């Protein structure tokens, strides 16, 4: 009898990188959890099925306190895929692994450019990047165009994604390489996550997160502001916290000194 020998198939191991939300709690943790609950209550499903990294580098907590924090997040359906900034002594079997090597900032040179005009004539803009955190800041309104004079930054090669159809409830569009433009509306329960700016030529009723990989010069433009949640470079705010006169209006938003500013467009 003849034996046929075959080599076993090799196991293929590949590396991939994925976009994950990074939560950076601050002390006291109970107060931070209350703010997180407020975010979740006003933006249902925000954390559902989303990979989350817990950054504890700035927290002086023990292993038991870390386990309790992870349990609190788990009870809120926040699934922690890994820990960042944790000491090895803080982690035991059954806890999420320690992650290293995350890059909150894009490795693209960012030259300075002059500010651009509002969205109807506006061209693609984008820039540098950082991670999202769970803190919030006030949205300021301004009637003066001089409040926008801070020069945005742009990549030498700008990339963009153009969507010619409305984004329906439950859909998630993630494009970290540059700007996202939607020729239509974004429904409640839908979300747009862009590495650059977001341009919506319709009603924004879902979630819009610009500068998701740390582009502080990113902006959000929409023809009708009714958003569930807005974020630029990890600073988030609910649209209902905006001045009432801006709701339902064409609006642009940008980040200035870690505060989201908003202005009505003509």
From Swiss-Prot:
Keywords assigned: Cell cycle, Cell division, Septation
Biological-process GO terms, alphabetical: cell morphogenesis; division septum assembly; regulation of cell division; regulation of cell septum assembly
Keyword Cell division: yes
Gene3D superfamilies according to UniProt: 2.160.20.70, 3.30.70.260
Pfam families membership: MinC_C, MinC_N
Region Disordered: start-end pairs: 98-146
Endoplasmic reticulum keyword on record: no
Compositionally skewed regions (Basic and acidic residues) per UniProt: 109-124
InterPro entries: CAP/MinC_C, MinC, MinC_C_sf, MinC_N, Septum_form_inhib_MinC_C
Quaternary structure and interacting proteins, as annotated: Interacts with MinD and FtsZ.
PANTHER family, alphabetized: SEPTUM SITE-DETERMINING PROTEIN MINC (PTHR34108:SF1)
UniProt record similarity statement: Belongs to the MinC family.
Role summary: Cell division inhibitor that blocks the formation of polar Z ring septums. Rapidly oscillates between the poles of the cell to destabilize FtsZ filaments that have formed before they mature into polar Z rings. Prevents FtsZ polymerization.
Name listed for the protein in its UniProt record: Probable septum site-determining protein MinC
Taxonomic lineage from the root: Bacteria, Pseudomonadati, Pseudomonadota, Alphaproteobacteria, Hyphomicrobiales
Gene: minC
